[in-house]
Amino acid sequence: RRAAGTVRDVGYDTNLDFELLAAMQPDLVLLYGISGENTIVTGKLRELGIPYIYVGDYVEESPLGKAEWLMLAAELCDRRDAGADTLRQIATRYEALRAQVDTTAARPRVMLNTPYRDTWFMPSSRSYMIRLIEDAGGEYVYTQNDSSSSVAVDAEEAYLLANDADVWLNVGACNTLGELTAQNPRFAAVPAVRNRRVWNNNRRQTPAGGSDFWESGVVRPDRVLADLIALLHDDGTADSCCCYYKRLE
């Protein structure tokens, strides 16, 4: 529908075209607010008599908890039973995959992300991504943060953490090892780079050019977990079987 032009662009954040939105007469508006309620938007929607719901999948720390938000779409589309059945299948496969590596002795250490203006943001050890890594039989290199958000780490400390990692994931816009080491020549000496164990979560692209990891991957943690198990334990199938991840060459 987007390609056919039947999905209208009404703006972003507080810059919404409320006149266009009102003319469309929506039954419901779905809102996404990382920093809490946007009272400018919600106040105007109430004034116009337009119902709204906040989608809060981003606050979920559990991969399966995040996937449960597919039930919102199922309810809105009058597909409750189909949604519940899909969610059960996802949960069953996720738990089966986790059980495969639950007792493995090898726990590869994992580094995440790349620097932004000389600052490295390291996720909380309670976060969604770290839960996935642990369920895949990996170990996060940064254990000093158990808050509810990422923390800034200076580039030198992050470089030392990267040197302690077996695998490096989610490297931003980098598509090759050359692009990664261009950010900092010292990255070439990091074990994960030398051993070609750097992976990015941008194998699948959306029609708009974004990473599908942050779209369909949100409600398919079983697929994400399968990717992570394959690449963390280097079973030889990851390059061909991964859905969301690709190895940097």
Residue ranges and their predicted role:
Residues 18, 41-43, 73, 130, ...:
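Short amphipathic alpha-helical segments and helix-helix/interface helices
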Residues 5, 16, 105-107, 193-195:
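Extracytoplasmic
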Residues 15-23, 43-47, 177-187:
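Alpha-helical segments with a strong preference for the paired helices of cellulosomal dockerin domains
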Residues 142-143, 148-240, 244-249:
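C-terminal soluble interaction/assembly domains
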Residues 92, 97-182:
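Flexible, glycine-rich surface segments
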Residues 6, 27-28, 37-119, 143, ...:
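Extracytoplasmic substrate-binding proteins
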Residues 1-24, 28-35:
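A short, structured surface patch at a secondary-structure boundary
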Residues 48-49, 136-137, 194:
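Short, structured coil segments at secondary-structure junctions
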